[in-house]
Amino acid sequence: MSYTIAAQIRTEIGKGSSRRLRHANKVPAVIYGPGKEAISIVFDHKDIINIQANEDFYTTDLTISLDGKDVAVRVQDMQRHAFKPLIEHIDFKFA
């Protein structure tokens, strides 16, 4: 199954800005890979919480729609809240 997630590039980096994003029901994330510069992104929590429950979300390539461009990525790491059903941060790797 193919997944497409709409995201925006984030300009504010750091702990404070990430906390503000999480408070606004957004998920900060980063896309990185060898030979390419890392891209900090943000997307809505509701866009990711339901599709991450599927097993193939972690094993197949995903498409992130980023400012009109489609970027193929794969989930590298996901940080979750300790006891709430929230995703706090996701690391993607270029596919």
Swiss-Prot record:
Any one annotated GO CC term: cytosolic large ribosomal subunit
One matching Pfam family: Ribosomal_L25p
Keywords, comma-separated and alphabetical: Ribonucleoprotein, Ribosomal protein, RNA-binding, rRNA-binding
GO molecular function: 5S rRNA binding; structural constituent of ribosome
InterPro entries in the cross-refs: Rbsml_bL25/Gln-tRNA_synth_N, Ribosomal_bL25/Gln-tRNA_synth, Ribosomal_bL25_short, Ribosomal_L25_dom, Ribosomal_uL5_bac-type
Gene Ontology biological process terms from the UniProt entry: translation
Function noted in UniProt: This is one of the proteins that binds to the 5S RNA in the ribosome where it forms part of the central protuberance.
Protein family according to the UniProt entry: Belongs to the bacterial ribosomal protein bL25 family.
Subunit structure: Part of the 50S ribosomal subunit; part of the 5S rRNA/L5/L18/L25 subcomplex. Contacts the 5S rRNA. Binds to the 5S rRNA independently of L5 and L18.
PANTHER family associated with the record: RIBOSOMAL PROTEIN L25/GLN-TRNA SYNTHETASE, ANTI-CODON-BINDING DOMAIN-CONTAINING PROTEIN, RIBOSOMAL PROTEIN L25_GLN-TRNA SYNTHETASE, ANTI-CODON-BINDING DOMAIN-CONTAINING PROTEIN
Protein name listed in UniProt: Large ribosomal subunit protein bL25
Organism: Shewanella piezotolerans (strain WP3 / JCM 13877)
